[in-house]
């Protein structure tokens, strides 16, 4: 009996990651440094100087005639036209991909303007198209924030799934003494985790396997998404890992109300079926009724006593996203009294999604270890978690000091006060 065997098909899904603009290029470099494998990296930018330092295998200069390699000048419209000028080159680079990740920092010129164009090209070629982008810091200005909002809305129209990470929330978890460059590099690191957490599901086979077809079913035409990674150890390791995966202070959406959720549990040789089931149940409870759970498991002998839970939730309702990022009119005093950092302990030099925790609302001073259940009094089914971003609180509201003088003081001339 003769069997025909398609060698090309046996190679698995072709995954390409495109870093657009400065932020996307930095994320690509971070992925290469961290040893992300099984994907092809492409860097696309209008700035030739930035492209000269990229570690991507494929480099594309966007709009060479329009920008002459000098960048987009912070104008998304220039970035868009540059991508359209280079559409043929982009199409050739993306062609043949089963899945395309588009990663960018929104708010600038190249990433904000070119990312939606690249997403349209990828989608037209039939690739599963996923956007992983960051929203800018509030201190970068309202204009940049508005550009980011417009760019994200345009990108959402052309991708199957969109994962948004809020840079501003880094301010809530980093130590005040953290150097600026180090804090900014952590935003690139989170972009890397967003991509790697999904690609690992496809490229790393497991005992209960999740393949590209499963990922495509979960992510095709699903809109807003959440991706989280949690690592736990000890007796409550699966509970700890699942909780950390569900909630990250950097993500703008919550798992509540998601349509489909991939849960991948990775552990050492001591990983049990009960633990995999428990992780699935925790995620199921947090997502609510009607969610479709896709469970996968894999063995990594190097993990020993640890368990890693990866969660990819899609189909998050838009009204819940809007609830998280909706404008809130609050005074400077109220803002200082109500907004507390997600972590009150020091900033780890390399922030990892797996190290995030969701704290109770009683505003603890320090995160103390406990021997009790990892759940504590935490309610998986609470209505929602509101994470504020600088895109919703104006710089005046955030930093303007409240005026405490009484009217008599204001009406008294200075020379009378000094008598």
Curated annotation (Swiss-Prot):
SUPFAM superfamilies cross-referenced by the UniProt entry: Tubulin C-terminal domain-like, Tubulin nucleotide-binding domain-like
Entry binding sites for GTP: 22-26, 109-111, 140, 144, 188
A GO BP entry: FtsZ-dependent cytokinesis
Keyword Disulfide bond: no
Protein induction: Protein level is negatively regulated by KhpA/KhpB at the transcriptional level (at protein level).
GO cellular component: cell division site; cytoplasm
CDD domains for the chain: FtsZ_type1
Disulfide bridge positions per record: none
Molecular-function GO term, any one: GTPase activity
Stretch list, region Disordered: 397-419
Keywords: Cell cycle, Cell division, Cytoplasm, GTP-binding, Nucleotide-binding, Septation
Cell compartments where the protein resides: Cytoplasm
Family: Belongs to the FtsZ family.
Protein name, UniProt field: Cell division protein FtsZ
Source organism (scientific name): Streptococcus pneumoniae serotype 2 (strain D39 / NCTC 7466)
Record lineage: Bacteria, Bacillati, Bacillota, Bacilli, Lactobacillales
């Amino acid at each position: 009996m003769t069997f025909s065997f398609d060698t090309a098909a046996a190679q698995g899904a072709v995954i390409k990651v495109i870093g657009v603009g400065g932020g996307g290029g930095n994320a690509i470099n971070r992925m290469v440094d961290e040893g992300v494998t099984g994907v092809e990296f492409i860097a696309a930018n209008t700035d030739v100087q930035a492209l000269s330092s990229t570690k991507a295998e494929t480099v594309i200069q966007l709009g060479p005639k329009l920008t002459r390699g000098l960048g987009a000048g912070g104008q998304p419209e220039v970035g868009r036209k540059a991508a359209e000028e280079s559409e043929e080159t982009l199409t050739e680079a993306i062609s043949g991909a089963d899945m395309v990740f588009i990663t960018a920092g929104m708010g600038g010129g190249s990433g904000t303007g070119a990312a939606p164009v690249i997403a349209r090209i990828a989608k037209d070629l039939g690739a599963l198209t996923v956007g992983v982008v960051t929203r800018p810091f509030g201190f970068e200005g309202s204009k940049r924030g508005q550009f980011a909002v417009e760019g994200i809305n345009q990108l959402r129209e052309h991708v199957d799934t969109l994962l948004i990470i809020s840079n501003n929330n880094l301010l809530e978890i980093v130590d005040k003494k953290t150097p600026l460059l180090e804090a900014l590099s952590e935003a690139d690191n989170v972009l890397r985790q967003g991509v790697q957490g999904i690609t690992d599901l496809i490229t790393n086979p497991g005992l209960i396997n999740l393949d590209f077809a499963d990922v495509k079913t979960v992510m095709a035409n699903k809109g807003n998404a959440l991706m989280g990674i949690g690592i736990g150890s000890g007796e409550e390791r699966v509970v700890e890992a699942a909780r950390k995966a569900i909630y990250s202070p950097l993500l703008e959406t919550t798992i509540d109300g998601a349509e489909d959720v991939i849960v991948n549990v990775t552990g050492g040789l001591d990983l049990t079926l009960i633990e995999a089931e428990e992780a699935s149940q925790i995620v199921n409870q947090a997502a609510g009724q009607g969610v479709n759970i896709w469970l996968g498991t894999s063995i990594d002998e190097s993990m020993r006593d640890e368990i890693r839970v990866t969660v990819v939730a899609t189909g998050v309702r838009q009204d819940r996203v809007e609830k998280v990022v909706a404008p809130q009119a609050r005074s400077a005093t109220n803002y200082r009294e109500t907004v507390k950092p997600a972590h009150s302990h020091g900033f780890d030099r390399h922030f990892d999604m797996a190290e995030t925790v969701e704290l109770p609302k009683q505003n603890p001073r320090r995160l103390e270890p406990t021997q009790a259940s990892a759940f504590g009094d935490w309610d998986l089914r609470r209505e929602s978690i509101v994470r504020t971003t600088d895109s919703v609180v104006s710089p005046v509201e955030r930093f303007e000091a409240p005026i405490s003088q009484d009217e008599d003081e204001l009406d008294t001339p200075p020379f009378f006060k000094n008598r």
